Protein backbone atom coordinates (compact mmCIF):
# COMPACT_ATOMS: atom_id res chain seq x y z
CA UNK A 1 0.00 0.00 0.00
CA UNK A 2 1.44 3.30 -1.14
CA UNK A 3 0.10 6.63 0.05
CA UNK A 4 0.95 9.49 -2.24
CA UNK A 5 -0.87 12.13 -0.25
CA UNK A 6 0.28 12.81 3.35
CA UNK A 7 -3.23 14.05 4.17
CA UNK A 8 -4.48 10.51 3.68
CA UNK A 9 -2.49 9.20 6.63
CA UNK A 10 -4.63 7.29 9.13
CA UNK A 11 -5.33 8.82 12.54
CA UNK A 12 -2.64 8.15 15.14
CA UNK A 13 0.03 7.68 12.53
CA UNK A 14 3.56 8.31 13.82
CA UNK A 15 6.65 8.18 11.66
CA UNK A 16 9.47 6.70 13.74
CA UNK A 17 11.43 4.41 11.38
CA UNK A 18 14.63 2.63 12.33
CA UNK A 19 17.93 3.24 10.59
CA UNK A 20 17.54 0.08 8.55
CA UNK A 21 13.98 0.96 7.49
CA UNK A 22 15.05 4.42 6.35
CA UNK A 23 17.70 2.99 4.06
CA UNK A 24 15.96 -0.15 2.79
CA UNK A 25 12.39 1.12 2.34
CA UNK A 26 12.92 4.82 1.61
CA UNK A 27 16.39 5.81 0.49
CA UNK A 28 16.88 2.78 -1.74
CA UNK A 29 13.49 3.32 -3.37
CA UNK A 30 14.14 7.00 -3.91
CA UNK A 31 17.50 6.35 -5.51
CA UNK A 32 15.90 3.80 -7.84
CA UNK A 33 12.99 6.17 -8.59
CA UNK A 34 10.59 3.70 -7.01
CA UNK A 35 7.62 4.84 -4.94
CA UNK A 36 8.11 4.95 -1.15
CA UNK A 37 5.61 3.35 1.26
CA UNK A 38 4.51 6.83 2.39
CA UNK A 39 5.22 10.00 0.49
CA UNK A 40 6.04 12.13 3.51
CA UNK A 41 9.74 12.80 2.78
CA UNK A 42 10.26 15.87 0.59
CA UNK A 43 13.04 16.45 -1.94
CA UNK A 44 14.98 19.47 -0.68
CA UNK A 45 18.58 20.52 -1.17
CA UNK A 46 19.28 21.17 2.52
CA UNK A 47 22.65 22.83 1.79
CA UNK A 48 20.86 25.85 0.36
CA UNK A 49 19.07 26.69 3.61
CA UNK A 50 19.69 27.19 7.28
CA UNK A 51 18.39 24.33 9.41
CA UNK A 52 15.78 26.51 11.15
CA UNK A 53 14.23 27.25 7.76
CA UNK A 54 13.80 23.60 6.81
CA UNK A 55 10.72 22.70 8.93
CA UNK A 56 8.57 24.92 6.74
CA UNK A 57 9.58 22.90 3.66
CA UNK A 58 8.75 19.43 4.93
CA UNK A 59 5.65 17.36 4.28
CA UNK A 60 5.36 15.77 7.70
CA UNK A 61 7.10 16.13 11.03
CA UNK A 62 6.76 17.55 14.48
CA UNK A 63 10.09 17.46 16.32
CA UNK A 64 12.24 15.90 13.61
CA UNK A 65 12.13 16.34 9.86
CA UNK A 66 13.19 14.05 6.98
CA UNK A 67 14.49 15.14 3.58
CA UNK A 68 15.93 13.63 0.42
CA UNK A 69 18.87 15.80 -0.57
CA UNK A 70 21.72 15.61 -3.12
CA UNK A 71 25.38 16.06 -2.18
CA UNK A 72 27.93 18.02 -4.18
CA UNK A 73 31.69 17.76 -4.22
CA UNK A 74 33.77 20.32 -2.44
CA UNK A 75 36.47 20.14 -5.13
CA UNK A 76 35.91 19.05 -8.77
CA UNK A 77 38.23 16.05 -8.58
CA UNK A 78 37.76 15.23 -4.89
CA UNK A 79 35.44 12.97 -2.95
CA UNK A 80 34.85 15.27 0.00
CA UNK A 81 31.29 16.67 0.17
CA UNK A 82 30.59 20.37 0.36
CA UNK A 83 29.15 21.04 3.85
CA UNK A 84 28.50 24.78 3.46
CA UNK A 85 24.83 25.57 4.05
CA UNK A 86 23.04 28.90 4.33
CA UNK A 87 24.80 31.16 6.87
CA UNK A 88 27.02 28.42 8.25
CA UNK A 89 28.20 24.88 7.71
CA UNK A 90 27.64 21.33 8.86
CA UNK A 91 30.50 19.69 10.71
CA UNK A 92 30.81 15.92 11.07
CA UNK A 93 31.20 14.46 14.59
CA UNK A 94 32.50 11.00 15.28
CA UNK A 95 32.93 8.24 12.72
CA UNK A 96 30.56 6.69 10.22
CA UNK A 97 28.25 3.98 11.56
CA UNK A 98 27.50 1.09 9.18
CA UNK A 99 23.89 -0.04 8.97
CA UNK A 100 23.35 -3.78 8.56
CA UNK A 101 20.36 -5.73 7.39
CA UNK A 102 18.50 -7.77 10.00
CA UNK A 103 17.33 -10.50 7.60
CA UNK A 104 19.41 -13.20 9.34
CA UNK A 105 22.99 -14.36 9.49
CA UNK A 106 23.09 -15.20 5.80
CA UNK A 107 21.83 -11.80 4.72
CA UNK A 108 23.50 -9.67 7.42
CA UNK A 109 25.06 -7.30 4.96
CA UNK A 110 25.82 -3.62 5.07
CA UNK A 111 23.03 -1.62 3.48
CA UNK A 112 24.19 1.89 4.23
CA UNK A 113 26.17 4.31 6.39
CA UNK A 114 25.00 6.79 9.02
CA UNK A 115 26.89 10.02 9.82
CA UNK A 116 26.14 12.59 12.55
CA UNK A 117 26.71 16.32 11.93
CA UNK A 118 26.28 19.59 13.89
CA UNK A 119 25.46 22.97 12.37
CA UNK A 120 27.81 25.93 13.01
CA UNK A 121 26.96 29.54 12.25
CA UNK A 122 29.63 31.55 10.48
CA UNK A 123 32.63 30.40 8.51
CA UNK A 124 35.12 27.73 9.49
CA UNK A 125 37.09 27.46 11.62
CA UNK A 126 35.54 30.21 13.80
CA UNK A 127 31.94 29.14 13.61
CA UNK A 128 29.50 29.18 16.52
CA UNK A 129 28.03 25.83 17.46
CA UNK A 130 24.25 25.50 17.50
CA UNK A 131 21.80 22.88 18.75
CA UNK A 132 20.80 21.69 15.28
CA UNK A 133 21.74 18.05 14.61
CA UNK A 134 21.59 16.06 11.37
CA UNK A 135 21.80 12.32 10.78
CA UNK A 136 22.81 11.65 7.20
CA UNK A 137 22.06 8.26 5.65
CA UNK A 138 23.65 7.16 2.41
CA UNK A 139 23.62 3.89 0.52
CA UNK A 140 26.42 1.36 0.54
CA UNK A 141 28.92 1.34 -2.33
CA UNK A 142 27.10 -1.28 -4.47
CA UNK A 143 23.69 0.36 -4.08
CA UNK A 144 25.11 3.81 -4.76
CA UNK A 145 26.74 2.64 -7.99
CA UNK A 146 23.46 1.09 -9.18
CA UNK A 147 21.49 4.20 -8.25
CA UNK A 148 23.78 6.45 -10.24
CA UNK A 149 22.54 4.91 -13.49
CA UNK A 150 19.62 7.32 -13.45
CA UNK A 151 19.89 10.96 -12.37
CA UNK A 152 17.09 13.51 -12.36
CA UNK A 153 17.53 16.34 -14.80
CA UNK A 154 17.22 19.14 -12.22
CA UNK A 155 20.08 17.73 -10.08
CA UNK A 156 22.21 16.44 -12.93
CA UNK A 157 25.72 17.90 -12.73
CA UNK A 158 28.38 15.44 -13.74
CA UNK A 159 31.20 17.69 -12.67
CA UNK A 160 30.27 18.47 -9.05
CA UNK A 161 27.62 15.95 -8.03
CA UNK A 162 28.85 13.42 -5.44
CA UNK A 163 25.60 11.65 -4.56
CA UNK A 164 22.27 12.06 -6.16
CA UNK A 165 20.34 11.29 -3.00
CA UNK A 166 21.00 11.02 0.69
CA UNK A 167 18.37 10.89 3.40
CA UNK A 168 18.70 13.48 6.15
CA UNK A 169 16.97 13.53 9.54
CA UNK A 170 17.23 16.96 11.16
CA UNK A 171 16.16 17.95 14.66
CA UNK A 172 17.03 20.54 17.29
CA UNK A 173 18.58 19.37 20.52
CA UNK A 174 16.97 20.73 23.65
CA UNK A 175 19.02 23.51 25.26
CA UNK A 176 17.37 23.19 28.70
CA UNK A 177 20.08 21.17 30.38
CA UNK A 178 19.40 20.18 33.94
CA UNK A 179 21.40 22.43 36.27
CA UNK A 180 23.98 20.89 38.51
CA UNK A 181 22.76 20.32 42.03
CA UNK A 182 24.58 22.67 44.40
CA UNK A 183 24.78 21.32 47.98
CA UNK A 184 23.54 23.69 50.73
CA UNK A 185 26.02 25.54 52.94
CA UNK A 186 25.01 23.56 56.04
CA UNK A 187 26.30 20.32 54.46
CA UNK A 188 29.82 21.84 54.29
CA UNK A 189 29.68 23.07 57.80
CA UNK A 190 28.54 19.76 59.35
CA UNK A 191 32.11 18.40 59.40
CA UNK A 192 33.39 21.41 61.29
CA UNK A 193 30.73 22.68 63.71
CA UNK A 194 31.44 26.13 65.05
CA UNK A 195 29.31 25.96 68.20
CA UNK A 196 31.19 24.97 71.37
CA UNK A 197 29.65 22.01 73.14
CA UNK A 198 30.05 21.06 76.75
CA UNK A 199 31.28 17.55 75.97
CA UNK A 200 33.58 18.65 73.16
CA UNK A 201 37.33 17.97 73.59
CA UNK A 202 39.29 20.89 74.98
CA UNK A 203 41.96 22.49 72.86
CA UNK A 204 43.76 25.79 72.66
CA UNK A 205 42.98 27.31 69.24
CA UNK A 206 45.37 29.67 67.57
CA UNK A 207 44.41 33.09 66.29
CA UNK A 208 43.88 31.78 62.75
CA UNK A 209 41.72 28.86 63.87
CA UNK A 210 39.66 31.11 66.13
CA UNK A 211 39.09 33.56 63.27
CA UNK A 212 38.04 30.77 60.92
CA UNK A 213 35.69 29.41 63.57
CA UNK A 214 34.04 32.82 63.94
CA UNK A 215 33.65 33.21 60.16
CA UNK A 216 32.16 29.74 59.79
CA UNK A 217 29.69 30.35 62.58
CA UNK A 218 28.64 33.71 61.13
CA UNK A 219 28.10 32.13 57.67
CA UNK A 220 25.95 29.33 59.10
CA UNK A 221 23.87 31.77 61.18
CA UNK A 222 24.46 29.78 64.37
CA UNK A 223 26.98 32.07 66.13
CA UNK A 224 25.41 34.05 69.02
CA UNK A 225 27.87 36.93 69.32
CA UNK A 226 31.52 37.77 68.93
CA UNK A 227 31.83 38.55 72.63
CA UNK A 228 30.55 35.13 73.62
CA UNK A 229 32.91 33.48 71.13
CA UNK A 230 35.91 35.35 72.54
CA UNK A 231 34.94 34.44 76.10
CA UNK A 232 34.45 30.78 75.20
CA UNK A 233 37.80 30.65 73.40
CA UNK A 234 39.61 32.27 76.34
CA UNK A 235 37.93 29.90 78.80
CA UNK A 236 38.89 26.88 76.72
CA UNK A 237 42.51 28.03 76.46
CA UNK A 238 42.73 28.64 80.24
CA UNK A 239 41.38 25.16 80.95
CA UNK A 240 44.09 23.64 78.81
CA UNK A 241 47.06 25.46 80.43
CA UNK A 242 47.96 24.02 83.89
CA UNK A 243 48.09 26.63 86.66
CA UNK A 244 48.77 26.79 90.38
CA UNK A 245 45.01 26.91 90.91
CA UNK A 246 44.99 23.15 90.27
CA UNK A 247 46.93 22.77 93.53
CA UNK A 248 44.26 24.64 95.53
CA UNK A 249 40.66 23.51 95.27
CA UNK A 250 38.83 26.56 96.58
CA UNK A 251 41.34 29.44 96.63
CA UNK A 252 43.59 30.29 93.74
CA UNK A 253 47.16 31.15 94.53
CA UNK A 254 46.87 34.25 92.40
CA UNK A 255 44.42 35.70 94.93
CA UNK A 256 47.15 35.67 97.57
CA UNK A 257 49.19 38.19 95.58
CA UNK A 258 46.44 40.56 94.40
CA UNK A 259 46.31 43.87 96.36
CA UNK A 260 48.86 42.77 98.94
CA UNK A 261 46.83 39.77 100.08
CA UNK A 262 43.99 41.91 101.44
CA UNK A 263 41.44 40.14 99.25
CA UNK A 264 42.61 36.73 100.45
CA UNK A 265 42.88 37.68 104.14
CA UNK A 266 39.14 37.88 104.71
CA UNK A 267 38.29 34.34 103.49
CA UNK A 268 41.31 32.93 105.32
CA UNK A 269 40.32 34.53 108.62
CA UNK A 270 36.72 33.47 108.12
CA UNK A 271 37.87 29.89 107.63
CA UNK A 272 40.01 30.11 110.77
CA UNK A 273 36.97 31.18 112.81
CA UNK A 274 34.74 28.43 111.45
CA UNK A 275 32.95 26.83 114.42
CA UNK A 276 32.16 23.60 112.60
CA UNK A 277 35.17 21.39 113.27
CA UNK A 278 34.48 18.84 110.56
CA UNK A 279 33.90 21.45 107.86
CA UNK A 280 36.95 23.35 109.09
CA UNK A 281 39.13 20.25 108.66
CA UNK A 282 37.93 19.79 105.07
CA UNK A 283 38.76 23.39 104.16
CA UNK A 284 42.18 23.24 105.80
CA UNK A 285 42.94 19.92 104.13
CA UNK A 286 42.21 21.48 100.74
CA UNK A 287 44.38 24.51 101.58
CA UNK A 288 47.30 22.92 103.40
CA UNK A 289 47.42 19.63 101.57
CA UNK A 290 50.25 20.74 99.32
CA UNK A 291 53.87 20.84 100.66
CA UNK A 292 54.59 24.20 99.01
CA UNK A 293 51.75 25.86 100.94
CA UNK A 294 52.84 24.22 104.20
CA UNK A 295 56.35 25.51 103.69
CA UNK A 296 54.99 28.99 103.02
CA UNK A 297 52.80 29.03 106.15
CA UNK A 298 55.59 27.65 108.33
CA UNK A 299 58.13 30.27 107.22
CA UNK A 300 55.76 33.21 107.70
CA UNK A 301 54.13 32.04 110.93
CA UNK A 302 57.37 31.21 112.70
CA UNK A 303 58.80 34.65 111.95
CA UNK A 304 55.69 36.41 113.27
CA UNK A 305 55.53 34.24 116.38
CA UNK A 306 59.12 35.13 117.14
CA UNK A 307 58.33 38.84 116.92
CA UNK A 308 55.10 38.70 118.91
CA UNK A 309 55.59 36.01 121.55
CA UNK A 310 58.85 34.08 122.02
CA UNK A 311 57.09 31.47 124.17
CA UNK A 312 54.52 30.79 121.46
CA UNK A 313 57.30 30.44 118.91
CA UNK A 314 59.12 27.96 121.09
CA UNK A 315 55.97 25.96 121.71
CA UNK A 316 55.16 25.88 118.04
CA UNK A 317 58.63 24.79 117.08
CA UNK A 318 58.63 22.07 119.75
CA UNK A 319 55.24 20.72 118.69
CA UNK A 320 56.27 20.70 115.04
CA UNK A 321 59.42 18.75 115.82
CA UNK A 322 61.78 21.38 114.44
CA UNK A 323 64.24 23.75 116.17
CA UNK A 324 63.76 27.36 115.14
CA UNK A 325 66.44 29.81 116.17
CA UNK A 326 65.22 33.16 117.47
CA UNK A 327 65.58 35.76 114.76
CA UNK A 328 68.16 38.45 115.10
CA UNK A 329 67.03 41.85 116.19
CA UNK A 330 66.39 43.95 113.16
CA UNK A 331 67.14 47.65 113.39
CA UNK A 332 69.62 50.44 112.75
CA UNK A 333 72.66 51.40 114.82
CA UNK A 334 72.34 54.99 116.03
CA UNK A 335 75.08 56.85 117.92
CA UNK A 336 73.83 58.87 120.88
CA UNK A 337 74.38 62.57 121.03
CA UNK A 338 76.38 62.37 124.28
CA UNK A 339 79.08 60.23 122.72
CA UNK A 340 78.10 57.05 124.58
CA UNK A 341 77.70 53.58 123.24
CA UNK A 342 75.69 53.20 120.08
CA UNK A 343 72.14 51.99 120.56
CA UNK A 344 69.95 49.84 118.36
CA UNK A 345 66.64 51.29 117.30
CA UNK A 346 64.05 48.61 116.62
CA UNK A 347 62.05 48.84 113.43
CA UNK A 348 58.37 48.06 113.07
CA UNK A 349 57.52 44.54 111.90
CA UNK A 350 56.35 45.83 108.50
CA UNK A 351 59.62 47.70 107.96
CA UNK A 352 61.62 44.70 109.10
CA UNK A 353 59.76 42.51 106.63
CA UNK A 354 60.47 45.02 103.88
CA UNK A 355 64.16 45.06 104.77
CA UNK A 356 64.39 41.26 104.76
CA UNK A 357 67.12 40.12 102.36
CA UNK A 358 66.36 37.74 99.53
CA UNK A 359 68.09 34.83 101.14
CA UNK A 360 65.18 32.44 100.78
CA UNK A 361 63.23 32.05 97.58
CA UNK A 362 60.03 31.12 99.36
CA UNK A 363 60.37 33.74 102.06
CA UNK A 364 61.12 36.49 99.56
CA UNK A 365 58.27 35.52 97.27
CA UNK A 366 55.42 35.27 99.74
CA UNK A 367 55.62 38.73 101.38
CA UNK A 368 52.02 39.71 100.91
CA UNK A 369 51.35 42.32 103.57
CA UNK A 370 50.34 42.70 107.16
CA UNK A 371 46.78 41.53 106.56
CA UNK A 372 47.98 38.15 105.26
CA UNK A 373 50.48 37.87 108.10
CA UNK A 374 47.69 38.22 110.63
CA UNK A 375 45.61 35.61 108.88
CA UNK A 376 48.57 33.25 108.52
CA UNK A 377 49.24 33.62 112.27
CA UNK A 378 45.73 32.45 113.07
CA UNK A 379 45.97 29.62 110.57
CA UNK A 380 49.31 28.50 111.94
CA UNK A 381 47.79 28.23 115.43
CA UNK A 382 44.99 26.09 114.02
CA UNK A 383 47.45 23.91 112.13
CA UNK A 384 49.60 23.42 115.21
CA UNK A 385 46.58 22.53 117.33
CA UNK A 386 45.47 19.90 114.82
CA UNK A 387 48.95 18.47 114.60
CA UNK A 388 49.09 18.19 118.42
CA UNK A 389 45.72 16.48 118.45
CA UNK A 390 46.98 14.00 115.87
CA UNK A 391 50.08 13.25 117.93
CA UNK A 392 48.03 12.71 121.10
From Swiss-Prot:
Per the record, its GO cellular-component terms are: nucleus
User: What SUPFAM superfamilies does the record tag this protein with?
Assistant: NAC domain
Q: Which GO terms describe its molecular function?
A: DNA binding
- Which Gene3D superfamilies does its entry note? NAC domain
- Ranges for the region named Disordered are 317-345
Q: Which residues form the signal peptide?
A: none
- Is-annotated flag, keyword Cell wall biogenesis/degradation? no
Its subcellular locations are: Nucleus
Domain NAC per the UniProt entry, residue ranges: 9-173
| GO biological process terms on file | abscisic acid-activated signaling pathway; regulation of DNA-templated transcription
| Chain's role | Transcription factor that acts as a positive regulator of the jasmonate (JA) pathway to mediate leaf senescence. May directly regulate LOX2, AOC, AOS2, AOC1 and OPR7, which are genes involved in the biosynthesis of JA. Regulates positively leaf senescence by directly targeting senescence-associated genes (SAGs) related to chlorophyll degradation, nutrient transport and other genes associated with abscisic acid-induced leaf senescence. Transcription activator that plays a role in mediating abiotic stress responses through the abscisic acid (ABA) pathway.
Which Pfam family, an example, fits this chain?
NAM
Q: Does the keyword Ligase apply?
A: no
What is the name of this protein?
A: NAC domain-containing protein 58
Which source organism? Oryza sativa subsp. japonica
Where is it expressed, tissue-wise? Answer: Expressed in leaves, nodes, internodes and mature seeds. Highly expressed in roots. Expressed in leaf sheaths, flag leaves and inflorescences. Expressed in primary and lateral roots, particularly in the vascular tissues. Expressed in the primary phloem of the culm and leaf sheaths. Expressed principally in the primary phloem and in the peripheral zone of the leaf vascular bundles. Expressed in the floral tissues.
The recorded induction information for this protein reads:
Up-regulated during leaf senescence. Induced by treatment with methyl jasmonate (MeJa). Induced by salt stress, cold stress, osmotic stress and treatment with hydrogen peroxide. Induced by treatment with abscisic acid (ABA).
> Which superkingdom is the protein from?
Eukaryota
PANTHER family given in the database record: NAC TRANSCRIPTION FACTOR 47 (PTHR31719:SF201), NAC TRANSCRIPTION FACTOR 56 (PTHR31719)
Give me the gene this protein comes from: NAC58
Any additional notes? Answer: Plants overexpressing NAC58 display an accelerated leaf senescence phenotype at the grain-filling stage. The gain-of-function mutant plants ps1-D (T-DNA activation tagging) exhibit premature leaf senescence phenotype. Plants silencing NAC58 exhibit delayed leaf senescence and an extended grain-filling period, resulting in significant increase in the grain yield. Plants overexpressing NAC58 exhibit a significantly reduced rate of water loss, enhanced tolerance to high salinity, drought and low temperature at the vegetative stage, and improved yield under drought stress at the flowering stage.
Q: What is known of its domains?
A: The NAC domain includes a DNA binding domain and a dimerization domain.
Sorted alphabetically, which keywords does the UniProt record give? Answer: Abscisic acid signaling pathway, DNA-binding, Jasmonic acid signaling pathway, Nucleus, Transcription, Transcription regulation
Amino acid sequence: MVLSNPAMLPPGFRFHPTDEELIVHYLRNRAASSPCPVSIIADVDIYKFDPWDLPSKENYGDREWYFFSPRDRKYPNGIRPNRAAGSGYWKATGTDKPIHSSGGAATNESVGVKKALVFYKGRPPKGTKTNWIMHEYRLAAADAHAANTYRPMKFRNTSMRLDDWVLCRIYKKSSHASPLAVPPLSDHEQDEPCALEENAPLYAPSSSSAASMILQGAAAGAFPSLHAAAAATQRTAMQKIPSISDLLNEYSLSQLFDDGGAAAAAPLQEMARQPDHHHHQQQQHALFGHPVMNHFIANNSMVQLAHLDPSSSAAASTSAGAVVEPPAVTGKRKRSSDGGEPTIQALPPAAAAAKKPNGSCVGATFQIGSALQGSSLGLSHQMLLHSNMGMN
